[in-house]
């Protein structure tokens, strides 16, 4: 999801303009309100992101404001930064598009996730993604299209996996703020942001130091997803029944699968070259 040659419109709120300025070097704000209904994942991710930020504020009540929105870039990336005393978190529209491309293609295949919905409704022979590059615009130029699941249950399940992968990335960026990583980079390196890919400050810190920050952010993000899984399954009660436990197992699988796919998109040579 990317809007080329985007112009700021008068209806942008002051907060949206703040986000745009903070993320300008990364692409600025994606005006997702202008996108077609096919971008339905965006509002859902935005809503859950606000919930995660609210939870972070409950745990760290003295934490300055954190603002989340989407970045107008076709590439996959997540960024946490600090600007004028406020924190900003953004994930690129390209991240959502690439997740849709991969996950929808899986659920559109009748031989995958056969226990979800009615696989017989799906096409038996789908075109393969012949050459994957981590840039939605480049894929679009080569004629690559998103294959959508035809069965409604499978489509809904696919959308959930996409949402959770994106939310894991949001939680990861929140952790970069709450764990002090962004402040550390600002005070020690002079770079007030952390980007998952194409980060200019990568060589400014030791690889082990960067790895430790990323590992800590992953830990906090997944812990947040597990907390949501317990809440939604009802398995956090001493009287949890078999169905609730099974539901918890399923949710943990979904979150783990989604996070793993995101890791692949961010760093597997088979995806990013």
Task: Give a label for each model feature.
Residues 174, 186, 190, 201-205, ...:
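A structural signal for the main folded, soluble domain(s) of proteins
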Residues 166, 173-189, 223-229:
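Catalytic Zn2+-binding segment of zinc metalloproteases
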Residues 154-166, 203-213, 240-256:
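Glycine-rich, flexible loop segments associated with nucleotide phosphate handling
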Residues 179-214:
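Post-HEXXH active-site segment of zinc metalloproteases
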Residues 210, 223-273:
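Long, well-structured alpha-helical subdomains associated
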Residues 1-164, 179:
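Hydrophobic or amphipathic, alpha-helical segments that drive membrane association/targeting
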Residues 217:
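Histidine- and acidic-residue-rich, metal-dependent catalytic cores
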């Amino acid at each position: 999801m990317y809007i080329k040659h985007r112009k700021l419109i008068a209806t942008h709120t002051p907060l949206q303009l703040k986000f745009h300025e903070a993320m300008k070097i990364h692409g600025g704000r994606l005006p997702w309100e202008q996108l077609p209904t096919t971008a339905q994942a965006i509002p859902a991710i935005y809503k859950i992101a606000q919930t995660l930020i609210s939870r972070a504020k409950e745990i760290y009540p003295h934490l300055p404001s954190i603002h989340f929105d989407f970045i107008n870039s076709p590439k996959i990336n997540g960024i946490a930064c600090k600007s004028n005393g406020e924190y900003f978190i953004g994930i690129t529209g390209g991240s959502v598009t690439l997740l849709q491309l991969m996950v929808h293609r899986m659920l559109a295949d009748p031989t995958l996730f056969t226990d979800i919905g009615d696989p017989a409704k799906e096409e038996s022979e789908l075109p393969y993604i012949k050459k994957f590059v981590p840039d939605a615009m480049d894929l679009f130029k080569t004629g690559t299209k998103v294959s959508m699941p035809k069965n409604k249950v499978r489509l809904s399940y696919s959308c959930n996996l996409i949402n959770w992968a994106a939310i894991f990335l949001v939680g990861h960026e929140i952790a970069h703020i709450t764990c002090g990583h962004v402040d550390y980079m600002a005070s020690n390196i002079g770079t007030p942001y952390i980007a998952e890919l194409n980060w200019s400050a990568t060589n400014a810190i030791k690889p082990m130091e960067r790895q430790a920050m990323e590992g800590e952010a992953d830990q906090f993000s997944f812990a947040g997803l597990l907390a949501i899984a317990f809440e939604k399954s009802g398995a956090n009660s001493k009287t949890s029944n078999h169905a609730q436990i099974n539901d918890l197992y399923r949710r943990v699988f979904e979150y783990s699968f989604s996070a793993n796919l995101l890791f692949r998109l961010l760093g597997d040579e088979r995806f990013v070259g």
